[in-house]
């Protein structure tokens, strides 16, 4: 993954170039390995590179052999080997997994993103037509913003982070996932159109446990495509533990296959070949990483998992004060004032710095499972299967403003890439079409949250299959990440906010906040910090607040401890 900045149809592009380089420098943390830029006509692309695939020849922006097309990409394309074979008539200039986007555009025009399997945000410039095409991956795992300026209405700007655009744009949006922009029509249209996106359509497909297992294993395998050392974020919760368990098996298998093959081609592209075999580089054993306050529930669980799956485990702790000291930087990098995002991002931000210092550039993470399977404890209060499903679809649709934003920005703040197997297109297609009655939380029937995901990896009735996880982990109750790192983390944030925000301040919110009024002192405190970095109203308009369903009788605080079924429930 990397950082991109683009300005299309700038009236004075050559004099603007120094400013473009300055703006792109604001996201150099995303791509510390190399900086590149290219100008065609009145358009400039700037790219900050984090090299993971195509190390020697994958620098960007990529220009086609005829010099007519320019491409800047932030992301990873997992099916690039197959796409290269599809586009065999095209003269490839690099071994980058992203370059197939150019021949796909030549053949399929703005439908090109439909053929990509990966996480991405890209801008492609067609100099013959003086046209820019921009697109974002189906769920929004990778961040992308689009902006305009009333001072130069014809110019369109794109960037990986908000901070690149606030100096030059007075109108900024978070580019919608699964959409493509075409300057010829000046419209953003949806290219990702699975049937499950219609939240009014309630699926009725019975659960297939083996299909869930097989699909998630394949999703993890794809995401181990790398030419650098990689690891896995391991909280000790169900989601990260399953990803770690599968990744450990796939890493072991890939190494065994490589050792058996005496004719390994050193030029073999990293990725999945036509036979489904993984070609990757890295350590011979999976490395796992965990963080928490001393004696946190997550740390204890993560140790058990690491020992069980045989990973080389790295445990890091932080103090409450270290977390508080990092808040301003976290909000600057996250570009949000949402309470639950900031609570969960701070430990992830601190851990990412530690991981990068150990020479790792890529990690797998467990985001997306709670949205797909209704794993948040407040889902237990869903009045019906239909409402359960509708809420699940809404949560998946909004992931780009919540957990995906957190996973992307808190890691990329240190040049560390996070990949999320649960948000694989095929896995989503399978699991979002399961009858929601199968997903509902029914404690009286012994069906806890994410029951069908747990059951899919329960090998109790399969004596010939090695267990994936210890039983107490496979069936461990859901903890919000911000809870699992230590309950005193959230308590400490609240107490500090209570001291920082007086009753008088809280009773008199800023007039320019409009209807978006903080309902707690903690939220007020974060909003003030956000405004210090991003005072523009258009910046605040890109933020979404993550709040449980009030009309289900849920507490407003997003902490899982406020859910009635939590083992350590507290009252609001």
UniProtKB/Swiss-Prot annotation:
The cross-references to CDD domains, in alphabetical order and at most eight, read: Asn_synthase_B_C (cd01991), AsnB (cd00712)
Domain named Glutamine amidotransferase type-2: residues: 2-186
Presence of keyword Electron transport: no
Q: List GO molecular-function terms, semicolon-separated.
A: asparagine synthase (glutamine-hydrolyzing) activity; ATP binding
Question: Has the keyword Amino-acid biosynthesis been applied to this entry?
Answer: yes
Q: Name one GO biological process term.
A: L-asparagine biosynthetic process
* One of the Pfam families matching this protein, by short name: Asn_synthase
Q: What class of enzyme is it?
A: ligase
Record domain Asparagine synthetase: where: 194-545
Q: What is this enzyme's EC?
A: 6.3.5.4
Q: In which pathway does it act?
A: Amino-acid biosynthesis; L-asparagine biosynthesis; L-asparagine from L-aspartate (L-Gln route): step 1/1
What cellular-component terms does GO give this entry?
cytoplasm; cytosol
Q: Supply the SUPFAM superfamilies for this chain.
A: Adenine nucleotide alpha hydrolases-like, N-terminal nucleophile aminohydrolases (Ntn hydrolases)
Alphabetical list of InterPro entries matching this protein:
Asn_synth_AEB (IPR006426), Asn_synthase (IPR001962), Asn_Synthetase (IPR050795), AsnB_N (IPR033738), GATase_2_dom (IPR017932), Ntn_hydrolases_N (IPR029055), Rossmann-like_a/b/a_fold (IPR014729)
Residues that coordinate or bind L-glutamine: 49-53, 74-76, 97
Disulfide bond residue pairs: none
Catalytically driven reaction(s)? L-aspartate + L-glutamine + ATP + H2O = L-asparagine + L-glutamate + AMP + diphosphate + H(+)
> Could you tell me the superkingdom of the organism this chain comes from?
Eukaryota
Residues the record marks as site: Important for beta-aspartyl-AMP intermediate formation: 367
Give the residues the record marks as binding ATP.
233, 291, 365-366
User: Which residues are responsible for catalysis?
Assistant: 2
Q: What else is known?
A: Present with 58200 molecules/cell in log phase SD medium.
Q: What PANTHER family does the database record attribute to this sequence?
A: ASPARAGINE SYNTHETASE, ASPARAGINE SYNTHETASE [GLUTAMINE-HYDROLYZING]
Under which name does UniProt file this protein? Asparagine synthetase [glutamine-hydrolyzing] 2
Organism encoding this protein = Saccharomyces cerevisiae (strain ATCC 204508 / S288c) (Baker's yeast)
């Amino acid at each position: 993954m990397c950082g991109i900045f683009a300005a299309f149809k700038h009236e004075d592009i050559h004099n603007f170039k120094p400013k473009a380089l300055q703006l792109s420098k604001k996201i150099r943390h995303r791509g510390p390995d190399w900086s590149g830029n290219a100008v065609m006509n009145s358009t400039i692309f700037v790219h900050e590179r984090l090299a993971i695939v195509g190390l020697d020849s994958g620098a960007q922006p990529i220009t086609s052999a005829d010099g007519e097309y320019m491409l800047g990409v932030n992301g990873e394309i997992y099916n690039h080997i197959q796409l290269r074979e599809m586009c065999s008539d095209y003269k490839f200039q690099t071994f980058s997994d992203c370059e197939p986007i150019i021949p796909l555009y030549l053949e399929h025009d703005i439908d090109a993103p439909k053929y990509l399997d990966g996480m991405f945000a890209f801008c492609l410039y067609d100099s013959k037509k003086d046209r820019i095409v921009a697109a974002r991956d189906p769920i929004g795992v990778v961040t992308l913003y689009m902006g305009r300026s009333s001072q130069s209405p014809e110019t369109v700007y794109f960037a990986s982070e908000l901070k690149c655009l606030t100096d030059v744009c007075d109108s900024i949006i978070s580019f919608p996932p699964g959409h493509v922009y075409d300057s010829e029509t000046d419209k953003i249209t949806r290219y990702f159109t699975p049937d499950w996106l219609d939240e009014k359509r309630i699926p009725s497909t019975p659960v297939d446990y083996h299909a869930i297992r097989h699909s998630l294993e394949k999703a993890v395998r794809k995401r181990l495509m790398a030419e650098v050392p990689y690891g896995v974020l391991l909280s000790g919760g169900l989601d990260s533990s399953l990803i770690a368990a599968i990744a450990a098996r796939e890493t072991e298998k890939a190494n065994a296959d490589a050792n058996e093959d005496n004719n390994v081609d050193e030029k073999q592209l990293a990725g999945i070949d036509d036979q489904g075999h993984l070609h990757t580089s890295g350590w011979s054993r999976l490395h796992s990483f965990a963080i928490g306050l001393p004696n946190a529930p997550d740390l204890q669980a993560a140790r058990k998992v690491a020992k069980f799956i045989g990973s080389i485990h790295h445990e890091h702790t932080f103090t409450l004060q270290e977390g508080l000291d990092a808040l301003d930087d976290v909000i600057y990098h996250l570009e949000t004032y949402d309470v639950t995002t900031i609570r969960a991002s701070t430990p992830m931000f601190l851990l990412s710095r530690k991981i990068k210092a150990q020479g790792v550039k890529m990690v797998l993470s467990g985001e997306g499972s709670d949205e797909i399977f209704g794993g948040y404890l407040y889902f237990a209060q869903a009045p019906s299967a239909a409402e359960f499903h509708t809420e699940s679809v809404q949560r998946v649709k909004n992931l780009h403003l919540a957990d995906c934003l957190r996973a992307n920005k808190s890691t990329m703040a240190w040049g560390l890439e996070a990949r999320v197997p649960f948000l694989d297109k095929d896995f989503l297609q399978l699991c979002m079409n399961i009858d929601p009655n199968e997903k509902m939380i029914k404690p009286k029937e012994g069906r806890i949250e994410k029951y069908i995901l747990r059951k899919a990896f329960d090998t109790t009735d399969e004596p010939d299959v090695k267990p994936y996880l210890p039983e107490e982990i496979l069936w461990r109750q859901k903890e919000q990440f911000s809870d699992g790192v230590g309950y005193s983390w959230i308590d400490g944030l609240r107490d500090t906010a209570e001291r920082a925000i007086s009753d008088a301040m809280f009773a008199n919110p800023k007039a320019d906040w409009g209807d978006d009024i903080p309902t707690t002192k903690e939220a007020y405190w974060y909003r003030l910090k956000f405004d210090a970095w991003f005072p523009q109203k258009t910046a605040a308009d890109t933020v979404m607040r993550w709040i449980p369903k009030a009309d289900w009788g849920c507490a407003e605080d997003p902490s899982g401890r406020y859910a009635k079924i939590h083992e350590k429930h507290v009252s609001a």
